[in-house]
Amino acid sequence: MTPELAHFDIGGREIAYRYRPGRGPTLVFLPGYASDMEGNKALELDAFATRTGRAMLRFDYSGTGSSAGRFEDGTLALWLEESLAAVDRLTDGPVVLIGSSMGGWLTLHLALLRPERVQALVLIAGAADFTDWGFEDAETAERKGIGRAFWRSGQELRLLSGEIAIDCPVRLLHGENDPDVPLDVAFRTMRALRSADVQLNVLKGGGHRLSEPHEIDAILRTVAALLEPAL
């Protein structure tokens, strides 16, 4: 049964979410850029939570999916603020953050902001610093559909230029042939993380979406393995 659609307010923005009660740690899914909580990976993870009795939270950033607002007004800082509020207000205890593409970038920031609560991270085609390596400048970003405000916000939240002071287990899954997020970004992220427990799984022939059945299976097996100590 699909969890009921609900909303919470932050700064006058109505953020849509679905929460499935269960035992912890709570799984929290963060969608990618221009995506939402009803995508295939989110639904497969929700089904996994149902089968295993896990609590799970998924939500839409403002301007996406069922949340209020205009997509073009969104910035990485704004969506980080909403993501932090969702974790703080809607979950208790330890969480496992699962981020797709841009959502992976946000999970890194959440782990830095709430190290005492984040038990593990899973980055699916994680796109850390994509405003940095994806575009030469604000004008290039704008031509590709990324607003100037979003680009500036992303530049202020870059992580890959130094050590990322995260110590929890981190799992990165990345497609060998990802056309949107170069595989090198996954290697850079792995090297930048301070944690000694970091694993990168390169999926042969995989693209960016990683939504094929065998790719979904790899994601679910990764999440399940991280949860084993909590069984």
PLM regions with names:
Residues 33-46, 184:
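The serine-hydrolase catalytic nucleophile loop
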Residues 42, 168, 182-191:
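Short alpha-helix in the alpha/beta-hydrolase fold that links the catalytic acid
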Residues 206-218:
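Catalytic histidine-centered segment of alpha/beta-hydrolase-like enzymes
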